[in-house]
Amino acid sequence: MKREDFAILKERVHRRELVYLDNAATSQKPQAVIDAISEAYTHWNSNIHRGVHHLSQVATSKHEEARQKVADFIGAKSSDEIIFTKGTTDSLNALAFSFGEAFIGEGDEIIVSGLEHHSNIVPWQMLCERKKAVLRHIPLREDLSLDIEAFKGLLSARTKLVSVAHVSNVLGTIQPIEEIIRLAHAQGVPVGIDGAQSVPHMQVNVQALDCDFLAFSGHKMYGPTGIGVLYGKREWLEKLPPHEGGGEMINHVRWSGTTYNELPYKFEAGTPNFVGSYALSKAIDYIQALGWEAIEAHERELTEYCEAQLSAIEGVHIYAEHQPKAGVISFNIFTNHQSPITNHQSLLHPFDVGTLLDQQGVAVRTGHHCAEPLIDALGVPGTVRVSFGLYNDKADIDAFIAALKKAIMMLS
């Protein structure tokens, strides 16, 4: 993998070489993506659609070519099924509002899982409060996998939608999405997928999965911030009302009422992030040039290597250890000192561990990772999370492990 394409990896933090292991929060950008942003603002910046002048036509072409590239990247039938958003959170909020307006009434139920990021919980809670509906969640088994038997019991005639994460942003575990979709579809229930942590790390084909909706972000897959995607099957998108009003999403506006644009534009009110979509297309080019087989093998090797190194450290507890993961590991460190209050092993606070790692140039994420219900289920205030990208290597992990051992020694 080409570390030299990522200029930020040459930065020094606290006079040390940067070891960036926070890719689940955001990824770094290859030079091709950075250059694309500069190119757009330097050579063809102009508002898109309806412009007859050259710059507008160039910008429009770049934006729509990016839409087609995204459609091909995830295996969509048509670029009309690709809605550009600000990111995964924006995509899920749009889905919750539009689907809720069309299909959710009092007493109806929506199912999520016990692993979800707040972005796949709160929009549904807001919808349920507005519509007097009910939000249910798939419980976790003791090994932190989803209880599929319990999920079968949750499905009923009242279930209107299932929305689940493909990969846990805390545990990194890959969920049995195919089985969830099959079970839901057998009951006539559509399924939305939070792909924020899967699309950057594995090949996702929406037609092969047969999911009805998919949300993901550009910034986690080596693209820029402020651009994301909501995929939806055409037959569903045509039934949903717009979630925002304004320019571009209209067909005609009269005092007597408004008619809406065709797909996908009826969901894209206002000036779109055409620079972001173009830069995202360059991130897709970068990923495809390396190839999914090589990327997945590389990140799987890193994850297994890191998990083995962590397991060898006394006091380290890895959550969902040995389960298939997509480049994310969460852990905590428990000392042998007994707590006078609980009479249990003392937890080294994740924030303290993360701070000492940062002082040694190692960037990780600590806390509840915007997944408080899951962290509550773990019975801890948070975790230390390491997450990998295609530019990481074993030297990064070795540096992290050495820094972690030093941090443990200092805190113990």
Predicted feature residues:
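Pyridoxal 5′-phosphate
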Residues: 1-412
